[in-house]
């Protein structure tokens, strides 16, 4: 996961990249005073690692401390619109990003470009299987905050934080797809 604050401060660009499956998508989290929207997105996807621009303040980083996600600082230019757009268009062999639906979202492009560049620099294998970038709108799905996810025991049990007695583990035992 990569997070890129919008220059005007109205939203955060969020990119999620799974290098094992090639799934790659971006979304936006509207800015709010306590970062609840952003923290809900982090709780929703539970990434192993989250990269952020190196200039993000320590006060802001402290807000992420309860998420359990490893935060890694990455150089600021990777998140810039121009650099990120070049990284993405080069990787996808495309002249523009309009086909991906995110051309007009600089924060989303910044996050996606930084995530892809970070993967290119840290992985010793080809990333050719990452063949598309999807754009997801938060308004197209129901959002459950971290407290609701915990109380419903979707991915983690309330008793000890184990993964054994959860909705996800029960569905994982089914023999047929739903």
In which residue ranges do the predicted regions lie?
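Charged catalytic and DNA/RNA-contacting regions of genome-maintenance
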Residues: 1-178
């Amino acid at each position: 996961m990569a997070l890129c604050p919008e220059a005007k401060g109205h939203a955060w660009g969020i990119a999620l990249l799974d290098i094992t499956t090639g799934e790659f998508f971006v979304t936006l989290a509207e800015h709010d005073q306590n970062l609840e929207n952003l923290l809900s997105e982090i709780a929703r996807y539970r990434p192993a690692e989250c990269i952020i621009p190196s200039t993000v303040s320590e006060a802001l980083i402290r807000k992420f401390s309860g998420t359990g996600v490893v935060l890694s600082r990455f150089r600021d230019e990777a998140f810039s619109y121009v650099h990120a757009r070049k990284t993405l268009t080069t990787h996808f062999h495309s002249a523009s990003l309009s086909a991906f639906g995110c051309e007009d979202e600089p924060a989303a492009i910044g996050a996606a470009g930084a995530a892809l560049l970070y993967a290119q620099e840290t992985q010793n294998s080809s990333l050719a299987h990452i063949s598309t970038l999807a754009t997801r709108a938060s308004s197209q799905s129901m959002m459950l905050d971290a407290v609701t996810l915990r109380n419903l025991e979707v991915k983690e049990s309330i008793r000890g934080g184990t993964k054994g007695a959860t909705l996800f583990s029960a569905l994982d035992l089914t023999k047929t797809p739903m």
